[in-house]
């Protein structure tokens, strides 16, 4: 009984101290929409994106609960010889929630196609990390006419035997999800971010602050809860339809999506090659942009 009381008290303390209201979008834009940030209207959404460099186009899609800022290291290096476009996906960053709540990978791939049309893109290389990788390979199946190459960085989307992380299960819960939508202590977010790095000492407080503040943008947490409730769609059965050169990058210390799933992507996509990034975790492109982008540069030079 005493342990139960202590547990209940601890829960109340977390709930009381962890409550965080949504952040005002305009205040966040004033802080984070600095050059070269732009906005474009796409299917009812005011989309935050960055477009830099000249040459063959590379479109990069970030992971869940992240933003275009996770690609900044890659973008700076790739833009020396390429046009590099990054964006905040619906329910993320400064773009904010989709009024129609379209967060399934296939739906976000269609949004991405509308975005590409708004920017009048032709054919391009598409890359994505985690959730963004899931969207990227869906896009390659749904719109093969536009895809020149595919880059998957610790990508999601394959059926997994391991249980989903506790945080994901809580967010998807019909009981606890609405509570967690408002209770988001910074220390829990910081802990989750550390778990995405092969070497957690590389994670800076500035990155934690940025990701945390953008996560609190009005509507983003509710969008995350909706997204986590999405089930698998079986589209992985069509991975064999992807015939463009494909680079599968995986941090060998990824504990979020294990490296064996990189092997599975390599085996199931006809022209795929796998490159393991030594010592890096789930957010390899952010943890070490120079090391992780090197195989990408070789792919683009072919």
Residue positions per predicted region:
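Conserved alpha/beta-hydrolase catalytic His-Asp/Glu region
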Residues: 162-164, 182-241
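Acidic catalytic loop of the alpha/beta-hydrolase fold
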Residues: 253-257
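Flexible "cap/lid" loop of the alpha/beta hydrolase fold
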Residues: 137, 141, 149-178
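Short beta-strand/loop motif that positions the catalytic acidic residue
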Residues: 242, 248-250
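Catalytic active-site module of serine/aspartate enzymes centered on a nucleophile-bearing elbow/loop
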Residues: 272-302
